[in-house]
Amino acid sequence: MANLCEMDLHVVSKKEEAIIAVKDAFTFNEDEGICAGRIYDSYVYEEGFNKETGEYYAYIMADVAWSVRSAILDKGILQKLIEKYNLDLEIYSEEPGCGFMEHFRWEGGEQIENEVADFALIHLDDMEDEDLRDEFFNMTIVKKYPITIDNYESFADEEGYIKLGGFDYDWVIN
């Protein structure tokens, strides 16, 4: 089984059919629509119509194999939809097992963002496991921070996660 990459996608269009096409591309039934790539789980967690802008939108979360680039973008189906409908579309992904995040963005069908960043994520409960703790401290990104076995708890957020590097989910496409 491949490492799973968690992805969050936001798409906006004046055409409802464009939003439906993107949602269909992330379904598991290839007989009913095209499949965007190696997707193990996906769901639309918000969708609607913005009366102020006259645009339809959808937010989709999914687990994909390895990375968005290898599981979806290399297949080319999503790009064809982006170009066909001149979509505004943005994707963030996290793959903490391999230590990276991705950020892709298109406006009017043109790609304007294509970024990858080192990323580490661990929960305080997992730091009690010596193997997981050692793996975390041996990640390249972790070595760039003043985090040690004595102070790691101070790096945790209110939910107990330590996140180093990566991107903030700062949606540009609204």
Label each region the model flagged.
Residues M1-T27, I173-N174:
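Short, extreme N-terminal segment that most often corresponds to the first beta-strand
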Residues G33:
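Pyridoxal 5′-phosphate
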Residues K23-E30, T140-I141, A156:
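Generic secondary-structure transition motif, activating predominantly at the C-termini of alpha-helices
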Residues A36-N174:
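Charged interaction segments
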